[in-house]
Amino acid sequence: MTAAAVAYAALGWPVVLGAYPRGNARSAGRACSCDRVGCPAPAAHPLSPAWQMQATSDPGKARQRWAHHPEANVILPTGRVFDVLDVPAAAGLAALEMMHDAGVATGPVATGSGRTLFFVATRGAPDNEDEWWSCHLDCAPEDVGEVVSLRWHCRNSYVLAPPSRDGAGPPGRWLQAPAEQGGRPLPDAVRLLEVLADACDEEIR
């Protein structure tokens, strides 16, 4: 995972050491390196509870940290450089095809652990956040509130980055890699929400 962590840091993306699968330990109820019985997110969470302070976009620091934990997954904190819209894998693939057909610009898109991740522009923590952060329409648009299978990862959250794996399936992979974006800005999340919400609704029906 070292090469992946260093590559993300070189993009200016903060990276964090992640927990990792424990071989065949799933049958014993200990599928995660954190050794917590019944871990709710096996191999899909940071190694340390201090992950927000430990996040780094320095390639040198990333290389040093993964040199000591080469098996660690790569965690990408959200709400800093990007947010992530997270939907079930099938719905995400259908939505991506619809966006391409409609000429809707998309950014990096990854898949893994039965989910599809759409990387979008972040809202970060603007100076006037107190005016809108608790507002349902701005913080969690109606589409998100009504579609329980659609998650919006923003500040204080994170996602598992390819080629990390949670032990339940194959490693994550990019459908549209960051390097393929050619310097284009990340899309506005709101522009993608309607298509993603519709795709999630179709999957549930």
Language model segments and positions:
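Catalytic core of tubulin tyrosine ligase-like
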Residues: 118
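Short, surface-exposed, polar/charged, turn-prone segments marking secondary-structure boundaries
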Residues: 112-115, 147-148
